[in-house]
Amino acid sequence: LDEANIAPSSCNFQPWRYIVVDTPEGKEKLGEANFNKTQNDTSSAMIVLLGDLSYFDKFDEIYGSAVEEGHMTEEVKENFRTGLEGMIEATTHETKRELVYFDCGIWTMQFANIVHAKGYDSNIIGGFDRKKVSELFELDESLMPVMLIAIGKKEKDARPSTRMEAKDLVTFE
């Protein structure tokens, strides 16, 4: 998890939070909301990836550390705060959600690549009842379930998936 946390994020806000579900009781609870029952039941662990819509509240913690570690001055931090406060105030709730989804997606790919490099497998799951997850895990309303990630060792190879070629996806101007 710490290795995945170095993933880049918008303004370095790191809006991801997660719940590691690795007990039979926890997996049974998550199973009530996870449409992928097989992965839920057979994985070593499931991660519930959450997006924190109150990410700006971590400003002092994140940028205070940058000052303490000598990466920026207090003056630069405060100038950055002023600019970001204006941006945050002008940002709609929907845009905040989009930014959090985007950043959590980057974290997920970082995590999946690290898991694979360590010899394990993962499956990223978007098919689940987000409202039910919020209820089951009694999440604060600032936290939104983004995706589930199954982790373990695969018993057999998955069927190959097909991919479109870049030439069918790209335009040049």
Predicted regions and their residues:
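Acidic, surface-exposed loops and disordered segments
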Residues: L1-E173
